[in-house]
């Protein structure tokens, strides 16, 4: 009998495994799918299936990522796992796989390692809001005190990066042992630990707010003048809903303007409203065509503001990815492509950093020559003469 399709009537959450190389991220991903598949909540995925991750291109950057899906009693999950450390860095910075929360895998035998720290920092920088911890390889540690010590270290590390370390759920277990149990058709103590982990994920990582329930944000792609009707701006609604009669703001590049929506159209048909994901034309009352341009955004009043200065976490493409062949230095002036337009800006490198090489990821400060609607979490590309040389995310607004 064919396995029935996953039901879509449960809330959907995006998560991923993060942590140091060889601490068991991929084994845990396989174990979750194996244990849940015994309950009819997932399709069994082999370790090798997950580890041989297909390469994807996101904004010209090659990233190897495995996507699996599974369910718990309460939710439907899409889970990302990356084979290499560089893939995580690229994935998190480009937002190729947005995560509503992450499972941090730490080997109980080794404790936190350099990439453990780096992934927690990246999660903080790119806005992964919640972390649940799986202390893996607990079968290799006989000393209960040692387990407690590792748990304390993890909590301190989370606190250091402004995650609530003291309240974070930490479940210890063995992904490999759970995988072996599930494959042997048993529900043993290690499988129970995987279920305990998924219960923690279910309860600790909140269901994300749907895009349609957020404040309106629509990047403007084009502007037309329709005689006798006024100015129409077109674009894809990123979040929220736009309705006829709404008061909205036009933000970015020029001083902020306030106007009223007099019409919404999709595929040349009049609509009462457009919502997140729709490509629409929005008719604006009393707005002149020359006052609006590509790169501005339509938004709910006061929900997003224009800025020229920000801090960002960026990944610089390698030569093989079509990026620069040479490093860049302080005061480098590329274009920053935010949503629909390029704005020139100058880069200030962190103290003690002389230059940035292709393939590096680094925290930079940027000053743009024109204000753009920005908030923490806004993604951008760094371009030079129309080609992408880097990808980034706003981690902090400076002015």
UniProtKB/Swiss-Prot annotation:
Q: Which residues bind GTP?
A: 19-26, 81-85, 136-139
Q: Where is this region: G5?
A: 174-176
Q: Which domain of life is it from?
A: Bacteria
Q: Where is this region: G3?
A: 81-84
Q: What is its subcellular localisation?
A: Cytoplasm
Instruction: Report the residue ranges that make up the tr-type G domain in this protein.
Output: 10-209
The alphabetical list of record keywords is: Cytoplasm, Elongation factor, GTP-binding, Hydrolase, Magnesium, Metal-binding, Nucleotide-binding, Protein biosynthesis
Instruction: Tell me a Gene Ontology molecular-function term this record carries.
Output: GTPase activity
Report what the protein is called: Elongation factor Tu
Source organism: Campylobacter concisus (strain 13826)
